[in-house]
Amino acid sequence: MRSRRDNSWVAQKFGGTSIGKFPDKVAEIVKSARLGGDRPAVICSARSSGKKVFGTTSRLLQVYRTLRGIVAITQDPDMQELLFDRLRSIIRDIRDDQVATVQMYILRQDIRDDTIRQITADCQELLDYTSAAKRFNLDINGKAKDKMVSFGEKLSCRLMVAMLRDRDIPAEYVDLSDIVPSNNLDQLRPDFFHEAAAVFGKRVEACNGRVPVITGFFGAVPGSLIDSGIGRGYSDLCAVLVAIGLHAERVQIWKEVDGIFTADPREVPDARCLPSITPSEAAELTFYGSEVIHHLALSLAIQAKPPVSIFVKNVQKPWGQGTVVVPTDGDDTSSWPIDYLDPSDSDSTSSTALPKMPTAVTIKRDITIFNILSNKQSMSHGFFVKVFTILAEHDISVDLISTSEVHVSMAINSSNMDPSQIKNVQCRLAEEGEVNVLPDMAILSLVGAELKNMTGIAGKMFAILGEQDVNIEMISQGASEINISCVIPDKDATRALNMLHDELFTKNAI
């Protein structure tokens, strides 16, 4: 068993809502870690005071979309100027929101004034960039989107540096948004993350005793950070890369909930916090609707030598145990710091200690089903190739699929698709067969490492839904041994989630 070393690095990643609502609590958590003998490396997401749609990142994506519209209508200068006024207004709102937060929380006048100057300069830089793009008709591509979105994390870091300095904790702003050489590549290489971790570690070590406050947005990522396979949630990945680069043994993911739950506690009042979970379970929950931990962050944490432990904790209850992501038997656990687990559960890293019951149940909304029946007598593989080629042309990935020789049903996340896109895909697919589209659906998933050893669990799950008249449009089991999923009408999603949780978790009926 390995004990925690004094003065060891710990990567502390704070979500945007934590920084938006509780910046004082965040600062106290960092201060406590430092005074307790740790070396905290603080990774910040972009601020959000409530729903994601109103957060800084969402506003910056509005700036990006508005700028694309401006550049696309060079023949209409009046409309361009109207749109640019709207763009300026969004940036002004972002600046004013950040400045108001600084004025509310920072007590020392010199720190407050200095931080407001930095925030104003950052927002002016963003405005200057958009103005240049409009004037010179620049290509507003994925790289441009990355540049604009990166300002959200920069502004969060400005605030948190000020919060720490206001508490007499020396802190340094660390911008990772353009620190990795891009080599002008369009696709991620397998060794990109290893190179990035080394660069991050070197930069953070250069802080020389000051607490590094690090932008969760990092780059340059070949292609684009936002539009690549990484996407939003990248700050989790950044935290793990920082930890790997520093040879840290722990990553803490700080949220506004106690840890990872058996179901979303906002929808299921009886949901309970899990003391531990496997990386594969966490990845499945993330994919199927629960905002747990970025899947690449989980993968890299377990592959690291030694593996990096991940703790999910509540920023409002820092004394709580939270949830620890525990590697499975197939992972190298020789250096895993098992002494960080609940001392009352010393066997919690052993698969034999896991109860034969599901780990969690989750819902993924904004799902649309496409049912396609081939109208040709061609071989099935030719039919499937054409279907998936059409989806690839529209940058659409499939969440669930069910197939026969001449029929395929696909569940697709339509949250970022407008009705015209869905119609275009439907028209293209109609060239290959009869198409039926079912909107307003949801994926209901039962997740657990022990599902493969639980005889009859699928039948029990579907029987519970059937008894309550929940119609099942699709069933998927087999691609993953730890997941049973089905697609149901969205209107029944919350009811179905609570029914399954009550029967399989609260009553412990298995």
From Swiss-Prot:
Disruption phenotype: Impairs the production of fusaric acid. Aspartate kinase; part of the gene cluster that mediates the biosynthesis of fusaric acid, a mycotoxin with low to moderate toxicity to animals and humans, but with high phytotoxic properties. L-aspartate is suggested as fusaric acid amino acid precursor that is activated and further processed to O-acetyl-L-homoserine by cluster enzymes aspartate kinase FUB3 and homoserine O-acetyltransferase FUB5, as well as enzymes of the primary metabolism. GO terms for cellular component: cytosol. Pathway: Mycotoxin biosynthesis. Disulfide bonds: none annotated. It catalyses: L-aspartate + ATP = 4-phospho-L-aspartate + ADP. It comes from the Eukaryota. Pfam families: AA_kinase, ACT_9. The keyword Transferase applies. The lineage of its organism: Eukaryota, Fungi, Dikarya, Ascomycota, Pezizomycotina. GO terms for molecular function: aspartate kinase activity; ATP binding. One of its GO terms (biological process) is homoserine biosynthetic process. Belongs to the aspartokinase family. Keywords: ATP-binding, Kinase, Nucleotide-binding, Phosphoprotein, Repeat, Transferase. This is Aspartate kinase FUB3. Fusaric acid is phytotoxic to plants such as cotton and banana. It has been shown to induce programmed cell death in plants. In addition to a mild toxicity to animals, fusaric acid exhibits acanthamoebicidal, antioomycete, and antimycobacterial activities. Its EC number is 2.7.2.4. Coiled coil: none annotated. Residues 372-440, 446-510 form the ACT domain. It comes from Gibberella fujikuroi (strain CBS 195.34 / IMI 58289 / NRRL A-6831).
